[in-house]
Structures are given as structure tokens and as C-alpha cells.
A protein has these predicted regions:
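N-terminal phosphate-binding loop and flanking beta/alpha elements of the actin-like ATPase fold
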Residues: 1-38, 44-141
Length: 141
């Protein structure tokens, strides 16, 4: 039995996931019927529930401090990096100094940009598994 691998385009604002079908890549549709998936994560301030993608994006106006977008811009960057300083002008959530690195603070907890990105990747993997009906073990990002 062959294993299915997926290809993921993890973007700053939008992401996509594809699988090979009939020798050709097929970009999967989200539950909303879109080929692109918002690279957004939110934590519900009342319930603590994590939302990813379109559900996170939809509640951003009501929950801006706990809605994380553009997280890819902070990956591997120091807190005092000029890119971080500039990006902070365009977001509403808190970026904090965690041992010199740029981390995101949500409801008093600090998360690395990589950890938040992993939540997006996990949702894309789940989307692919739901589509293929198989467990996905390999991915190219």
C-alpha cells in the first residue's frame, strides 16, 4: 500500500494543501469551498477554544488581541529585529520578548511563532486526511 504525501504552502496570510491524484497535484477545498485557507489562529477568550482558518478570521473584529495573523513574519526572528518592529505596527495582538526571541502572548501565555504555525499545519493535515480518508504521514512544506 502506498503512502499519500501532501504538499503545503504555508503563507503569511493564506495557505493551501494539495495531494497527488492521477499523477497531478489537486489543491483541496476548505469546508467553505475555497482553495485557500486563512493563516489565522484565535483563542476564544471565554472558552479557551482554539479556532483555525476561516472561523478564526471571522471572529477577529470581536477578539483582536487573541487573533493571530501574519505569524510567519515572526518565525526565527529576534524581538528587536527591524522586521518585527515594523510588523508590530500592523497587528493588534502582543509580541513579547522571550529570551530575545519574538513570541506571541495570548491570554497571558507565550507561544513561539512556530507553535502557532503548527496549529495551522495540523488543521491542513486534518483537511487532507478527511479528503483522502487516509492517515497522512508525509508532507512537503
Amino acid at each position: 500500500m502506498s503512502r499519500k504525501a501532501i504538499g503545503i504552502d504555508l503563507g503569511s496570510t493564506m495557505s493551501e494543501v494539495a495531494v497527488i491524484e492521477g499523477g497531478e497535484p489537486k489543491v483541496m477545498l476548505t469546508t467553505e469551498g475555497s482553495r485557500t485557507f486563512p493563516s489565522v489562529v484565535a483563542i476564544d477568550k471565554k472558552t479557551g477554544e482554539r479556532k483555525v482558518g476561516a472561523p478564526a478570521k471571522r471572529q477577529a473584529i470581536m477578539n483582536p488581541k487573541n487573533t493571530i495573523n501574519l505569524v510567519k513574519r515572526f518565525m526565527g526572528r529576534k524581538f528587536d529585529d527591524p522586521e518585527v518592529i515594523e510588523a508590530k505596527k500592523h497587528i493588534q495582538y502582543d509580541i513579547v520578548n522571550h529570551n530575545g526571541w519574538a513570541y506571541i502572548q495570548i491570554e497571558g501565555k507565550e507561544y513561539s511563532p512556530q507553535q502557532i504555525s503548527s496549529w495551522i499545519l495540523a488543521e491542513l493535515k486534518k483537511m487532507a486526511e478527511d479528503y483522502t480518508g487516509e492517515t497522512i504521514t508525509d508532507a512537503v512544506i
